[in-house]
Regions:
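Alpha-helical macromolecular-interaction surfaces
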Residues: 20-21, 86
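Conserved beta-strand-loop-alpha-helix junction that forms the acyl-donor binding cleft
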Residues: 13-18
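Conserved active-site tyrosine of GNAT-family acetyltransferases
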Residues: 22-27, 91, 127
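Vicinal oxygen chelate
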Residues: 1-11, 32-123, 133-143
Length: 143
């Protein structure tokens, strides 16, 4: 594997309040741990081509304002999965409520086509909004 295959060009790093609780959540929805560090508590996770970093909040962290729940207000992270219903079932096993049940959405990508995805939205233990998507393909826009 080459270095460019190891690291995505953009990898979000999320401050979390309890790394172990976050790891339990992210593993349950399908992420794998690439590596961990203990000081400060940190983990690098992958799911298919998606990558994310988690770091337990600490006094030396890069925090520009007080962290208040829900964390990450104003953003959602889209993560492609093979099957949204499988992800939904994994969330049920944790007893978590979803933010939005699976539904199909179509987005215009050109003047003639739109691409669809089945979407499931859920908040992680710190409130970050995650949008798990299953691609549905492309279709012509009817006029």
């Amino acid at each position: 594997m080459t270095e460019s295959e190891l690291w995505s060009a953009l990898v979000p790093e999320l401050s979390v309040t309890d790394l172990e609780a976050s790891l339990n959540f992210y593993r349950t929805v399908g992420f794998q741990v690439r590596f961990v560090r203990t000081s400060p508590p940190f983990a690098y996770l992958t799911l298919g081509d998606a990558q994310i970093m988690l770091e337990q909040a600490h006094s030396e962290g890069w925090v520009v304002a007080p962290l208040e729940r829900p964390f990450g207000r104003g953003i959602n992270l889209q993560i492609e999965v093979d099957n949204v219903q499988s992800t939904r079932a994994a969330l049920t096993s944790l007893g978590l409520q979803v933010f939005r049940e699976p539904s199909d959405s179509w987005y215009q990508v050109s003047g003639a086509y739109e691409e669809g995805q089945r979407e499931l939205l859920v908040q992680d233990p710190d409130g970050y909004l995650l949008r798990f998507v299953q691609p549905l393909g492309r279709r012509s826009i009817e006029r």
